[in-house]
Amino acid sequence: MTERAEGASKAPRSERVTLPSLVASPEDLDPGLILRVAAGDRLQLAPALLAEVQRRCEAAREVLRHGGPVYGVNTGMGALAGVRLSEAEQLAHQRNLLLARASGGPPWLDAADARALIAVRLRTFLSGDSGVSGALCQRLAELLGQGIVPAIPRAAAGCAGEITPLAHAFGPLAGIGRVLGPPGGEPEPHERAGDAQLAAAPAQPGAGTMPAAEALRSRGLAEFALGPREGHALLAGVPGATALALRRLADARALESVMEAAAALSIAAAGAARDPYAAAGARGDAVMAGVLGRLRAAIGDDPEPRALQAPVSFRVVGPVLGHVLRACDTLESAVGRALSGVTDSPAFLDGRFLGTAGFHGIDLGAHCDQLTAALAHAAEVATARVHRLLDARVTGLPAQLAPRPGPDTGLVTVHKRAAGEVHALRRLAVPASIGLIETSGGQEDVQSFAWESAEALRGALRHAHVVTACELLTAFQACSISQRPAPAGCRPMLRRLAEIIAPIEADRPFGEDIEAVLSEGLRSWPWPFRPGAG
């Protein structure tokens, strides 16, 4: 539960002080709280929970003192797993694990993604499966509270698991590597060169970095001394793919809602027959029934449709967006399994260390790929609707929605922008979780590439947002010049768009309108029929 300082509810939003959220059990650090931590919330770990984590840690260390070889603790890793380490080597081994494995580079995850990753890692540690200390869990919470955000590479993991990005994520605990710096921090080489890939990613204010050791000193924190197995535990599992999938899932659900709104405006503008949106057509499919119900609430009835059948892209809105929502649901289930399941290897279970396959994130990767494909299809269908809205035969409106067809070009290049975005999105829809590459001398001969699947989903969302903005702009213009009265359920959306888009009375650079819809219209969208809204 999130507590607020006394009187904070009466203060302006910018002045409110939020107290840390109390975590009394691993389950308290649920997806909703992880998203709030990503946005900046702090955590307070209950003393009883830390005591239980420490009890499990002591039991694990007792097994280590008297047991045989344990992978990554008293042995090497990967192809060197057969090498036993001396007691002296074991003392330095856990810190060393975070050194050479940090082979990634920029562009970095933004601060929210990085904070979500730390929160997921903390959630898995609080289960006790890792055998780490309560002090390590407390330090992770302190890093979140102090705003120390590691510089974690976005791409090129190439691991069975996530060892490379996790080495970057948790090296700063021990003063290794770099963290995202304040505005004016040291720029990265690609930043100085104007790297296009960074420009396409969400910008981090003053996106430079600073040495982790310097950041710790500036906050009065010592470098954390890793105990037995703690370096290896920090590199285990799939906390990155879990965090990225959770963040993209929230983005996808929000976007799907706006896609419904854009489709509703297009249906109204085209005067499409309403039969495909009838409740009877969704028998046996509760998800599609929800989509169709929200569409009906927006578009109402049309006693005089322009044609017996509208083009297919208008008729299939229910199945297309229902599939997007189902893909969100299945990805949400995969995230839940990753948060509650065993992802450590070896994991400390039933009083012994047990090698597991918890690092293999195919469940997350495959479902990220599925959602990317669903978004690609939805964007393709939306782009087809944009094209049809420019066609006077479909709408009865001036060709290309131009104020003066011929002297004015109209919105034809808005459709071409959408077509270009869809072309880029299709390339991202190739499943990232397929394609194995042997590493570590064949010891790691399989990867799931779940991290890459989550990154592909991020790109897909970016392109799908632009396509949706193109449809909103086109449908707005069509509704604006149509003699048909707008359905009552669509009027709040049209009023909102009218606040953003000036009347189109002649050709102009429509890219500016698309950017305005992206930056303003999609941020606070008045779609009153959101899923779950009643």
Each predicted region: which residue ranges?
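Intrinsically disordered, low-complexity proline-rich regions
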Residues: 1-18, 159, 186-205
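Short, conserved acidic/polar surface loops in the N-terminal third of protein domains
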Residues: 9, 82-84, 129
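C-terminal auxiliary extensions adjacent to catalytic cores
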Residues: 15-49, 56-64, 68, 167, ...
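Glycine-rich, flexible loop motifs
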Residues: 17-67, 94-152, 249, 281-282
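FAD-binding core of FAD-dependent oxidoreductases
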Residues: 71-93, 100-125, 151-175, 194, ...
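Acidic, glycine-rich active-site loops and adjacent beta-strand->loop/helix elements
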Residues: 77, 123-124, 144, 156-161, ...
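General N-terminal targeting signals
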Residues: 87-88, 94, 114, 134, ...
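Short helix-coil transition sites and intra-membrane helix breaks within transmembrane domains
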Residues: 129-130, 163, 379
